[in-house]
């Protein structure tokens, strides 16, 4: 029999207090997950650690962002604890409407839900107007100290321009490697977060995290989104949430529960995104068993980067597109720099550019401008820097040459090509059904990711 049970809620951590030790132990085990590769750890081998990360400790303490999940699990066993909320939250907010901008219904509903719930991971596909949602939240809460975290300077710059030039908001500051402008509302890359600790760590009431899935694994990035002890408004934004338990619980614990805004297929059906035709090229197995004793890196180098047959297929696709289209805009994404340079040399076409992380922002914008403005068909080759944060609506064809497994990487890359533009009614996507060790399972995963989003998939 339970004599007492209540949850004390604070900004960063909350605590379940009860005399039912069995219940606490059950939650301790339920919120425990094995860390990948734990069996190789010295601590595990010496029996000093069981290989688990725990999100609910033996004293009943857990991250407040997991409160909704904990309450749901308690309800399953007919437990309804009293809630003691120790937070001091200013629930007043200003109007979130932006001048000369009309929200889609799902955008306005998301802003309203964020202001009501105060802690949410907003799952919104590429092209759904995530930055517009951020703008509405910032305007509504603009009288508070606020931090918006980014993992890339390019995303920060785009958001700064939107908030200041489109939304006409004031008191907006920026902080990144070589730049600093103070503002009560501070846009900051996680790499430069140390520069705002004195001014914003203790007083920030609102924390927003762009591309928040990028923050839930690294020690520094996770520590950043778990900080800010007075930030009772906490919002993350991503197109794809983590599927593995540890990063998923890291993210929810620091921010809050996931709220799905709308699906990509919904946006396509409503005419807000371009319909993709995904074509999977069925490649023959070319390793003849030589891949069996190779590591992943060796397989990738041999059968992706240096694979002449596969690379020549990409060249043939590009040539075929150019023959059939006068002004095609072809995006090719690679995982490695060497692969990008190999394809650049192989294609050797005019109006072709290769972008990498080392390129400055001005170099990137110049390359994108050339890509857009070419009178004939043009090709843009890039690495991960083109996966997120770059809006090139003119893309008509997308070749995913990376052979990656990740759902996040696959769908974010696809999202680059789906934005609407007057020059296209559909976008053609090319990917590969590779067969070699590791690559075969990764190809099947990508196919599954495409189908999960209800896209049309054709095998060539």
Segments the model singles out, each with a brief description of its role:
Residues 48-55, 73-77, 81-123:
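Conserved pre-motif I regulatory segment
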Residues 356-453:
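Conserved RecA-like P-loop NTPase helicase motor core
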Residues 157, 170-182, 329-333, 341-342, ...:
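Conserved helicase ATPase core of P-loop NTP-dependent helicases/translocases
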């Amino acid at each position: 029999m339970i004599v007492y049970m209540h949850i004390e809620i604070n900004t960063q951590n909350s605590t379940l207090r009860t005399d039912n030790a069995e219940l606490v132990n059950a939650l301790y085990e339920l919120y425990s997950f094995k860390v990948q590769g734990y069996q190789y750890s010295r601590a595990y081998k010496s029996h000093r650690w069981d290989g688990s990360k725990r999100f609910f400790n033996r004293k009943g303490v857990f991250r407040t962002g997991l409160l909704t999940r904990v309450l749901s699990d308690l309800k399953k066993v007919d437990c309804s604890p009293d809630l003691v909320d120790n937070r001091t939250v200013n629930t007043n907010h200003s109007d979130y409407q932006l001048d000369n901008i009309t929200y889609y219904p799902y955008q306005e509903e998301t802003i309203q839900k964020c202001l009501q719930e105060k802690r949410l991971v907003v799952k919104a596909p590429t092209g759904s107007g995530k930055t517009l949602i951020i703008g509405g939240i910032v305007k509504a809460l603009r009288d508070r100290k606020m931090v918006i975290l980014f993992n890339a300077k390019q995303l920060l710059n785009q958001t700064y321009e939107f908030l200041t030039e489109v939304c006409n908001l004031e008191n907006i500051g920026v902080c990144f490697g070589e730049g600093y402008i103070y503002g009560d509302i501070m846009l900051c890359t996680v790499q430069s977060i140390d520069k705002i600790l004195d001014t914003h760590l203790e007083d920030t009431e609102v924390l927003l995290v762009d591309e928040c899935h990028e923050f839930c694994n690294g020690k520094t990035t996770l520590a950043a989104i778990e900080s800010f002890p007075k930030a009772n408004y906490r919002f993350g934004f991503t197109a794809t949430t983590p599927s593995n338990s540890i990063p998923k619980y890291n993210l929810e614990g620091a921010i809050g529960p996931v709220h799905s805004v709308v699906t990509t297929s919904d946006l396509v059906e409503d005419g807000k995104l371009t319909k993709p035709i995904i074509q999977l090229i069925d490649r023959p197995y070319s390793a003849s068993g030589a891949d069996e004793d190779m590591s992943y890196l060796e397989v990738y180098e041999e059968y992706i980067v240096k694979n002449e047959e596969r690379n020549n297929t990409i060249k043939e696709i590009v040539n075929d597109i150019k023959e059939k289209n006068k002004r095609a805009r072809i995006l090719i994404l690679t995982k490695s720099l060497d692969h990008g340079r190999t394809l650049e040399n192989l294609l050797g076409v005019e109006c072709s550019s290769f972008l990498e992380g080392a390129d400055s922002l001005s170099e990137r914008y110049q390359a994108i401008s050339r890509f857009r403005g070419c009178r004939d068909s043009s090709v843009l080759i890039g690495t991960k820097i083109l996966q997120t944060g770059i809006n090139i609506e003119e893309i008509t064809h997308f070749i995913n040459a990376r052979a990656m497994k990740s759902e996040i990487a696959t769908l974010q890359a696809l999202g680059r090509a789906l934005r609407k533009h007057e020059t296209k009614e559909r976008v053609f996507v090319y990917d590969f059904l590779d067969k070699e060790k590791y690559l075969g399972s990764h190809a099947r995963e990508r196919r599954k990711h495409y189908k999960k989003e209800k896209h049309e998939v054709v095998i060539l």
